[in-house]
């Protein structure tokens, strides 16, 4: 196993560890009839009364003055037992449907229809607040963080599978990272089944894979000399490489979105070790991927230089420069694509979350 493969295996282990931690934390802390993990966007009762006094016969100046005075008291924070929470009829719920929160964020609160009874106990309305929006942060972790971490892990595993298939059958630059075609899993299971059940040695698929090895060597030499030209002449190979690249960057972007736990409204109620673990996970994954990319690029450059020396001994410098420039160009395109995806995810994260997770 090469160094790059070891680093990617470590990235998989880190992703699995982070996912297990999130599932454990949600399962351990999900307690019914508990408001400690909920965040409420509230407005004081006096401000809400001012908003209710807006009438059609008021002047524009008066309406703006009342709206400006009533907009200030809106606050977002955890459940405060010194306050009386009254759920507004049009209060919105974040991250999960209402039926999953009835036993948690709605506990120890009153409905707007109970306002008359509440005002009898608290006639001054000083400690009464109206809930405009609320979120169950355990549901946030489960319906967003866990799903995102699972999707990132699955996409990264799919990338590793596609990458292994390419190194086994498709073009590659680093000759040290190629996989023998005879190690194809179908060849192994076919040979094993023939020996166990039919008591014979099945070698046809193995011979066919040896022929593929010869063809693959020719493809590798063409790919090493002119990478961009090879992709232009073989659009299917370009499509498969694009799928591999998309899976890779999509998994990295999905993994990086776990940092939202430090910036979303739920960050005020989630414990510090959850937020610190998210930073540690993203930093470790980023370090592993950077080291893996540097090592992989170094190997590809060395392999391309060796291939150019074998095939074109009279034009080594030109071949090496062409390969290095093509690789740098591809890396720049990959980096630009990643930056655009991250910017788009940050700008339209709410729409993306609504469409993907519901």
Swiss-Prot record:
Q: Which UniProt keywords apply?
A: Glycoprotein, Host cell membrane, Host endosome, Host Golgi apparatus, Host membrane, Membrane, Signal, Syncytium formation induced by viral infection, Transmembrane, Transmembrane helix, Viral primary envelope fusion with host outer nuclear membrane, Viral release from host cell
Q: Which Pfam families match?
A: Fusion_gly_K
Q: Under which name does UniProt file this protein?
A: Envelope glycoprotein K
The entry annotates sugar attachment on 57, 80
Q: How does it sit in the membrane?
A: Multi-pass membrane protein
Q: Which domain of life is it from?
A: Viruses
Q: Name one GO cellular component term.
A: host cell plasma membrane
* The protein's role, per its UniProt record: Glycoprotein that probably modulates membrane fusion events during secondary envelopment of cytoplasmic capsids that bud into specific trans-Golgi network (TGN)-derived membranes. Also plays a role, together with gB, in virus-induced cell-to-cell fusion (syncytia formation). Seems to block fusion of virions with infected-cell membranes.
Q: Which residues cross the membrane?
A: 142-162, 236-256, 274-294, 324-344
User: Does the keyword Glycoprotein belong to this entry?
Assistant: yes
Per the similarity annotation, which family is this?
Belongs to the alphaherpesvirinae glycoprotein K family.
**Complex formation:** Interacts (via UL20 interaction region) with protein UL20 (via N-terminus); this interaction probably plays a role in the coordinate transport of protein UL20 and gK to the trans-Golgi network (TGN), and is required for the cell surface expression of gK.
Q: Which GO terms describe its biological process?
A: fusion of viral membrane with host outer nuclear membrane; symbiont-mediated induction of syncytium formation
Organism from which the protein derives: Psittacid herpesvirus 1 (isolate Amazon parrot/-/97-0001/1997) (PsHV-1)
The positions making up the signal sequence are 1-33
Q: Key word Transmembrane present in the record?
A: yes
Q: Which residues lie on this side of the membrane: Cytoplasmic?
A: 163-235, 295-323
Report the InterPro entries cross-referenced here. GK
User: Where, subcellularly, is it found?
Assistant: Host cell membrane; Host endosome membrane; Host Golgi apparatus membrane
> Which residue intervals are topologically Extracellular?
34-141, 257-273, 345-358
């Amino acid at each position: 196993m090469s160094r790059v493969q070891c680093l990617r295996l470590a990235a998989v282990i880190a992703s699995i560890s982070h996912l297990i931690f999130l599932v454990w934390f949600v399962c351990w802390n999900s307690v019914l009839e508990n408001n400690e993990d909920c965040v409420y966007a509230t407005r004081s009762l006096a401000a809400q009364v001012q908003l209710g006094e807006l009438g059609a016969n008021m002047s524009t100046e008066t309406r703006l003055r009342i709206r400006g005075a009533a907009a200030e008291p809106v606050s977002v924070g955890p459940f405060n037992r010194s306050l009386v929470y009254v759920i507004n009829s049009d209060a919105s719920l974040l991250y999960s449907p209402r039926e999953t929160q009835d036993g948690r964020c709605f506990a120890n609160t009153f409905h707007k229809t109970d306002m008359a009874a509440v005002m009898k106990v608290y006639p001054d309305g000083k400690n009464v607040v109206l809930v405009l929006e609320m979120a169950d942060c355990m549901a946030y972790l489960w319906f967003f963080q866990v799903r995102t971490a699972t999707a990132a892990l699955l996409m990264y595993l799919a990338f590793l599978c596609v990458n292994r298939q390419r190194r086994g059958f498709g073009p590659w630059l680093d000759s040290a990272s190629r996989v023998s075609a005879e190690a194809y899993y179908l060849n192994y299971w076919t040979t094993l089944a023939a020996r166990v059940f039919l008591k014979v040695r099945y070698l046809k698929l193995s011979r066919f894979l040896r022929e593929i090895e010869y063809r693959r060597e020719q493809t590798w030499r063409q790919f090493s000399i002119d990478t961009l030209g090879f992709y232009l002449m073989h659009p299917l190979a370009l499509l498969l490489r694009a799928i591999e690249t998309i899976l890779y960057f999509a998994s990295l972007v999905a993994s990086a979105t776990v940092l939202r736990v430090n910036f979303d409204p739920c960050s005020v109620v989630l414990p510090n070790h959850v937020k610190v673990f998210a930073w540690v996970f993203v930093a470790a994954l980023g370090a592993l991927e950077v080291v893996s990319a540097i090592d992989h690029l170094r190997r590809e450059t060395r392999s391309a230089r060796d291939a150019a020396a074998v095939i074109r001994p009279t034009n080594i410098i030109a071949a090496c420069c062409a390969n290095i420039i093509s690789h740098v160009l591809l890396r720049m395109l990959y980096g630009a694509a990643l930056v655009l995806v991250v910017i788009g995810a940050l700008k339209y994260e709410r729409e993306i979350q609504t469409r993907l997770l519901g």
